[in-house]
């Protein structure tokens, strides 16, 4: 059997990883400033993380959600305390797309409506509902196009108000920072207005924090810079540091009913053990503060680099727009300097390193970037 060929792949096969480093099968060492799409939050193969998973696997790795699992409540309690959402409820699933799909369902259940407001250039996932609210027709099959969705410009509150005034909106969904689009963020003032408009009109606001959450921006969630509390928050990626897990944080305004949501694998013992270890390490190593400080340092130094046209983002979720003559720098960094970075629309370089990255590793990147653009 062959693999279904849908991925554009680099001719590199990592076989080992530790901290902010990966090694390929030839033994070449790479500095990882991408973390596999912002998944690696506490660093590759963190000892506490590895120990937690191994010990749990030796006890019980899985049983379905037909029995008690105290690890789920331990995870919910720690996540609530660290994120500032102790009064919310947690639904556990397996991925970001699944988290967003369930968030959209919850909003529709509550309002009895089905039309969704999303934002141009958004990316929310590849399941039927999430791909419908993703502004990319090339990944939408005819089957996905029956959903009622309207896309408005980011930071355009008038367009949001106009759509909500029609009275048929089930929810508004927005990314804490748009990642795939090229690192574009809603302004704090816009998020405050959006939160106010949604609350006034009883329209649930869903904050997709799958890429921007879990401390990446220097706060636990990116929307917390705006001091708002959305109705639903979704998370995944950095939540499991590579182990598949997703979560939906749900306001007390939503009433749980048996069977309204469900999953076979979501919240299994291994996934919870991984996610608990991630939260423990984030606290013990002050990784949210490190993300803020290292992000500030990165932006400060990048602003001194003549080849850089623009820098966007917060903390360790940054987009670097280089001048056109340096369009091949990402390839040069990967194949000559052995540094992984990410891409986004319009040639933007995305930096999404582990939250544990050191100033020394950032300096290596900055030095190589300057050399390649001199």
Where are these regions (language model features)?
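Conserved N-terminal phosphate-binding loop of PLP-dependent enzymes in the Aspartate aminotransferase
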Residues: 1-374
């Amino acid at each position: 059997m062959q693999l279904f060929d849908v991925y554009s792949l680099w001719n590199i096969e990592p076989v080992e990883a530790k901290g902010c480093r990966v090694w390929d099968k030839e033994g070449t060492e790479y500095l990882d400033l991408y973390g596999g799409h912002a998944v690696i939050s506490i660093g590759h193969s963190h000892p506490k993380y590895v120990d937690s998973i191994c010990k749990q696997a030796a006890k019980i790795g899985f049983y379905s959600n037909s029995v008690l699992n105290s690890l789920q409540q331990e995870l919910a309690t720690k996540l609530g305390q660290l994120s500032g959402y102790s009064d919310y409820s947690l639904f556990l699933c397996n991925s970001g797309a699944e988290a967003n799909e369930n968030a959209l369902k919850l909003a529709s259940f509550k309002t009895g409506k089905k039309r969704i407001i999303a934002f141009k250039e958004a990316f929310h996932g590849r399941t039927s509902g999430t791909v419908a609210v993703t502004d990319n027709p090339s990944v939408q099959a005819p089957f996905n196009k029956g959903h009622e969705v309207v896309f408005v410009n980011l930071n355009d509150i008038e367009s949001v108000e106009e759509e909500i005034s029609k009275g048929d909106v089930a929810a508004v969904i927005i990314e804490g920072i748009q990642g795939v689009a090229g690192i574009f963020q809603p302004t704090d003032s816009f998020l405050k207005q959006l939160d106010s408009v949604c609350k006034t009109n009883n329209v649930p606001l869903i904050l997709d924090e799958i890429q921007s959450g879990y401390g990446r921006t220097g706060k636990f969630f990116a929307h917390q810079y705006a001091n708002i509390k959305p109705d639903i928050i979704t998370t995944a990626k950095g939540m499991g540091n590579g182990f598949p897990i997703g979560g939906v944080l749900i306001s007390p305004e939503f009433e749980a009913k048996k069977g309204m949501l469900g999953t076979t694998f979501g919240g299994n013992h291994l996934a919870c053990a991984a996610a608990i270890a991630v939260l423990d390490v984030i606290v013990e190593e002050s990784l949210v503060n490190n993300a803020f400080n290292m992000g500030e340092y990165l932006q400060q130094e990048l602003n001194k680099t003549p080849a850089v046209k623009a820098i966007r983002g917060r903390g360790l979720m940054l987009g670097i727009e280089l001048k056109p003559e340096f369009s091949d720098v990402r390839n040069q960094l990967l194949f000559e300097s052995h540094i992984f970075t990410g891409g986004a629309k319009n040639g933007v370089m995305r930096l999404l390193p582990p939250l544990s990255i050191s100033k020394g590793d950032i300096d290596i990147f900055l030095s190589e970037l300057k050399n390649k653009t001199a």
